[in-house]
A protein has these predicted regions:
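Catalytic machinery of carbohydrate-active enzymes
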Residues: 1-322
């Protein structure tokens, strides 16, 4: 068995995108096994993947260069990998990769395409074209290590019994979120004919979604009530998930559930559409010259009006569902 050590420590959605790549890699390379190193709370994302060992770490235990030397020593002693795949390409992971290279491991590192992404999101003279999907960038790391991998880009449903509509109205940044009033209006319409399950996390989100649950029939908030494993099971059973450009889109992709995705300041051209999801299920304002203004939606709107989100009509989302 050829043993590969791979790592990425954040963010949640980015780590979730790795899972289908690893599944297809292991299926196509039966003589390999993977040890995946990440934050402990991401473990359930990798549950049930054959020939994959998840190694959770608390990064506070491995601070600075000396801490990373300690982690390298531990991982090498526990697993003695022949190959090392850096799926993060940040300072911490770069140091780890150098330390493994000094131990004569064959290493490869993610190419994030930073220059192309800057060209896509800059204010003037944008180069607006589809960039390589992030999942293909992850796959390239394994190809650089000398393995073959052809991604299917297909959804694989985890549940045959599908019913209800999921809705995850929140995202990490304002530039990725429908105005909350529009989201509430959408739930009001959807719940007239469908069971609607609401997803979110954090106290503020839990409070908002609990209020909607109390006010509306056919609406259940699951925010703050489930473990990650339980949440994935629920999402797998949905007929469709409505999500912003957020981790929920990637969780649904992981369990083979169709996603109608809403895009504001960010753009799927940057390569972050959920694995196996269709561009036909994207809701966006297409002809805004200012869009995309950032890769992650974390920059304030320089126009000041968030037209990319405020101009979206809920009827456009409903059309995709019907």
């Amino acid at each position: 068995m050829k043993k590969i050590l791979a790592y990425r420590f954040s963010a949640f959605g980015d780590v979730a995108m790795i899972v289908p790549v690893l599944k297809e890699f292991l299926a196509q390379n039966p003589d390999t096994e993977i040890v995946f190193v990440s934050r402990k709370n991401f473990a359930d994302l990798f549950d049930g993947v054959e020939r994959l060992t998840f190694r959770g770490v608390n990064l506070d235990d491995y601070k600075g260069v000396f801490g990373l030397r300690k982690l390298t020593k531990e991982l090498n002693k526990e697993y003695n990998p022949k190959y090392v795949a850096d799926l993060h390409d940040v300072l911490r992971s770069k140091i780890l990769t150098i330390l493994f290279k000094l131990r004569r491991k064959k290493t490869a590192t993610l190419d994030k395409g930073r220059t192309e992404k800057k060209q896509l999101t800059r204010k003037e003279n944008k180069i607006k074209k589809p960039l390589k999907p992030t999942t293909e960038r992850y796959a390239d790391v394994f190809r650089k290590l000398g393995f073959t991998l052809k991604l299917s880009h297909q959804l694989i449903p985890k549940s045959q019994q599908k019913s209800g509509i999921g809705f995850a109205p929140f995202a990490q940044h304002e530039g990725k979120m429908l105005p909350i009033e529009k989201s509430l209006d959408l739930v009001k319409v959807l719940s007239q004919k469908n069971e609607v399950l609401l997803f979110g996390g954090g106290k503020k989100e839990v409070d908002v979604l609990s209020k909607w649950e109390q006010e509306l029939d056919n609406v259940t908030s699951l925010a703050g009530k489930l473990s990650l494993k339980e949440e994935l099971k629920k999402i797998a059973e949905l007929e469709v998930m409505i999500s912003m450009d957020s981790a929920n889109m990637h969780l649904a992709s992981l369990v083979g559930t169709r996603v109608v995705s809403v895009w504001g300041a960010t753009h799927y051209f940057a390569g972050f559409l959920g694995y196996g999801q269709s561009e036909n299920d994207i809701v966006e304002i297409k002809n805004l010259e200012c869009r995309p203004c950032s890769v992650f939606g974390n920059k304030p709107c320089y126009r000041g009006d968030y037209a990319c989100l405020n101009q979206i009509e809920i009827s456009e989302i409903l059309k995709k569902i019907e």
